[in-house]
Amino acid sequence: MSLDDQGVASFLTDVLIVEDDPTQAEELACYLRRARLRVEATVSGSLAIHTVARLRPKVALIDYNLPDLDGVTVAERIKRLSPGTAMIVMSGRIDRLSDHTLANTGIFTFMNKPVALGPLRSAVLTLIRTTTRTGLPPPLPKKRLLPLSFGSFSLT
Protein backbone atom coordinates (compact mmCIF):
# COMPACT_ATOMS: atom_id res chain seq x y z
CA MET A 1 0.00 0.00 0.00
CA SER A 2 1.24 3.47 -0.82
CA LEU A 3 -0.28 6.92 -0.50
CA ASP A 4 -1.41 8.96 -3.49
CA ASP A 5 -1.20 12.77 -3.74
CA GLN A 6 -4.21 13.20 -1.45
CA GLY A 7 -2.85 10.80 1.19
CA VAL A 8 -5.31 8.04 0.24
CA ALA A 9 -4.09 4.45 0.40
CA SER A 10 -3.46 2.78 -2.96
CA PHE A 11 -2.95 -0.91 -3.57
CA LEU A 12 -1.12 -2.59 -6.44
CA THR A 13 -3.42 -5.60 -6.61
CA ASP A 14 -6.91 -6.44 -5.42
CA VAL A 15 -6.61 -10.08 -4.34
CA LEU A 16 -3.76 -12.40 -3.42
CA ILE A 17 -4.66 -16.09 -3.44
CA VAL A 18 -2.43 -18.28 -1.27
CA GLU A 19 -3.23 -21.85 -2.31
CA ASP A 20 -0.87 -24.79 -2.85
CA ASP A 21 -3.30 -26.62 -5.17
CA PRO A 22 -2.74 -25.03 -8.61
CA THR A 23 -6.13 -26.16 -9.92
CA GLN A 24 -8.00 -24.55 -7.02
CA ALA A 25 -5.87 -21.40 -7.22
CA GLU A 26 -6.56 -21.03 -10.95
CA GLU A 27 -10.29 -21.64 -10.50
CA LEU A 28 -10.49 -18.95 -7.81
CA ALA A 29 -8.34 -16.54 -9.82
CA CYS A 30 -10.37 -16.96 -13.03
CA TYR A 31 -13.64 -16.49 -11.17
CA LEU A 32 -12.46 -13.32 -9.42
CA ARG A 33 -10.92 -11.91 -12.62
CA ARG A 34 -14.36 -12.15 -14.25
CA ALA A 35 -15.41 -9.55 -11.66
CA ARG A 36 -12.62 -7.34 -13.10
CA LEU A 37 -10.36 -7.80 -10.09
CA ARG A 38 -6.57 -7.79 -10.29
CA VAL A 39 -5.56 -11.18 -8.90
CA GLU A 40 -2.19 -12.76 -8.09
CA ALA A 41 -1.63 -16.28 -6.76
CA THR A 42 1.16 -17.96 -4.80
CA VAL A 43 1.67 -21.60 -3.81
CA SER A 44 3.23 -21.21 -0.35
CA GLY A 45 3.16 -19.05 2.74
CA SER A 46 6.69 -17.75 2.30
CA LEU A 47 6.01 -16.71 -1.31
CA ALA A 48 2.80 -15.05 -0.14
CA ILE A 49 4.66 -12.96 2.44
CA HIS A 50 7.18 -11.85 -0.21
CA THR A 51 4.34 -11.00 -2.61
CA VAL A 52 2.41 -9.03 0.04
CA ALA A 53 5.47 -6.92 0.75
CA ARG A 54 5.69 -6.09 -2.96
CA LEU A 55 2.03 -5.73 -4.03
CA ARG A 56 0.06 -4.78 -0.88
CA PRO A 57 -3.18 -6.56 -1.85
CA LYS A 58 -6.54 -5.35 -0.61
CA VAL A 59 -7.60 -8.91 0.23
CA ALA A 60 -5.66 -12.12 0.85
CA LEU A 61 -7.40 -15.50 0.48
CA ILE A 62 -5.27 -17.92 2.48
CA ASP A 63 -5.45 -21.70 2.51
CA TYR A 64 -4.99 -22.95 6.07
CA ASN A 65 -2.97 -26.03 5.06
CA LEU A 66 0.09 -24.83 3.16
CA PRO A 67 3.29 -26.84 2.63
CA ASP A 68 5.55 -24.49 4.60
CA LEU A 69 3.43 -22.42 7.01
CA ASP A 70 -0.10 -22.67 8.34
CA GLY A 71 -2.65 -20.05 7.32
CA VAL A 72 -2.71 -18.36 10.74
CA THR A 73 1.06 -17.81 10.67
CA VAL A 74 0.78 -16.39 7.16
CA ALA A 75 -2.04 -14.09 8.30
CA GLU A 76 -0.01 -12.85 11.28
CA ARG A 77 2.92 -11.96 9.02
CA ILE A 78 0.68 -10.31 6.43
CA LYS A 79 -0.92 -8.20 9.17
CA ARG A 80 2.52 -6.94 10.24
CA LEU A 81 3.63 -6.17 6.66
CA SER A 82 0.38 -4.78 5.31
CA PRO A 83 -2.15 -3.80 7.99
CA GLY A 84 -4.54 -2.61 5.28
CA THR A 85 -4.93 -6.09 3.80
CA ALA A 86 -8.16 -7.86 4.75
CA MET A 87 -7.82 -11.64 5.12
CA ILE A 88 -10.03 -14.66 4.59
CA VAL A 89 -8.78 -18.13 5.56
CA MET A 90 -10.08 -21.17 3.68
CA SER A 91 -9.94 -24.69 5.06
CA GLY A 92 -11.50 -28.09 4.74
CA ARG A 93 -11.50 -28.18 8.55
CA ILE A 94 -12.83 -25.08 10.26
CA ASP A 95 -12.72 -26.58 13.74
CA ARG A 96 -9.05 -25.61 14.05
CA LEU A 97 -9.76 -21.89 14.14
CA SER A 98 -11.33 -20.21 17.15
CA ASP A 99 -12.84 -16.73 17.21
CA HIS A 100 -10.04 -15.78 19.60
CA THR A 101 -7.40 -16.83 17.05
CA LEU A 102 -9.21 -15.00 14.25
CA ALA A 103 -9.52 -11.80 16.28
CA ASN A 104 -5.85 -11.83 17.31
CA THR A 105 -4.60 -12.34 13.75
CA GLY A 106 -6.93 -9.92 11.99
CA ILE A 107 -8.59 -12.61 9.89
CA PHE A 108 -11.95 -11.24 8.74
CA THR A 109 -13.61 -14.63 8.26
CA PHE A 110 -12.98 -18.21 7.31
CA MET A 111 -14.71 -20.33 4.72
CA ASN A 112 -15.13 -24.06 4.44
CA LYS A 113 -13.61 -25.84 1.45
CA PRO A 114 -14.72 -26.51 -1.14
CA VAL A 115 -15.42 -22.79 -1.28
CA ALA A 116 -18.72 -21.66 -2.76
CA LEU A 117 -17.61 -19.15 -5.39
CA GLY A 118 -20.62 -16.80 -5.20
CA PRO A 119 -20.40 -16.11 -1.45
CA LEU A 120 -16.60 -15.86 -1.71
CA ARG A 121 -16.84 -13.25 -4.46
CA SER A 122 -19.43 -11.29 -2.45
CA ALA A 123 -17.19 -11.31 0.63
CA VAL A 124 -14.15 -10.25 -1.42
CA LEU A 125 -16.02 -7.41 -3.14
CA THR A 126 -17.36 -6.16 0.20
CA LEU A 127 -13.86 -6.19 1.71
CA ILE A 128 -12.41 -4.41 -1.33
CA ARG A 129 -15.03 -1.65 -1.23
CA THR A 130 -14.41 -1.05 2.47
CA THR A 131 -10.62 -1.24 2.18
CA THR A 132 -10.53 1.07 -0.84
CA ARG A 133 -12.60 3.70 0.94
CA THR A 134 -10.67 3.72 4.21
CA GLY A 135 -7.25 2.22 3.47
CA LEU A 136 -7.93 -0.22 6.32
CA PRO A 137 -9.74 -3.55 6.46
CA PRO A 138 -13.27 -3.43 7.87
CA PRO A 139 -13.86 -4.02 11.58
CA LEU A 140 -13.81 -7.71 12.43
CA PRO A 141 -17.29 -9.22 12.69
CA LYS A 142 -18.42 -10.91 15.88
CA LYS A 143 -19.56 -13.90 13.84
CA ARG A 144 -16.92 -15.12 11.39
CA LEU A 145 -18.52 -18.12 9.72
CA LEU A 146 -20.27 -17.13 6.52
CA PRO A 147 -23.82 -18.49 6.20
CA LEU A 148 -24.28 -21.37 3.78
CA SER A 149 -27.51 -22.53 2.22
CA PHE A 150 -28.41 -25.54 0.10
CA GLY A 151 -31.97 -25.47 -1.23
CA SER A 152 -34.27 -25.07 1.75
CA PHE A 153 -31.52 -26.02 4.24
CA SER A 154 -29.50 -23.15 5.71
CA LEU A 155 -26.54 -22.92 8.10
CA THR A 156 -25.86 -19.58 9.76
Task: Label the model's feature ranges.
Residues 44, 70-73:
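Acidic catalytic/metal-coordinating carboxylates
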Residues 73, 94-112, 122, 126:
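Alpha4 helix (beta4-alpha4-beta5 surface) of REC/receiver domains from two-component response regulators
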Residues 41-59:
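Acidic, metal-coordinating helix/loop segments flanking the phosphotransfer/catalytic sites
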Residues 50, 72-84:
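Short amphipathic alpha-helix used as the core "switch/output" element in two-component signaling
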Residues 21-40:
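Two-component/phosphorelay signaling modules centered on CheY-like receiver
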Residues 41, 66-69:
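Residue-level signal for the "D+5" position in two-component response regulator receiver
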Residues 1-16, 118-156:
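Non-catalytic signal-transmission and effector/linker regions of two-component phosphorelay proteins
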Residues 63, 91:
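Active-site residues of response regulator receiver
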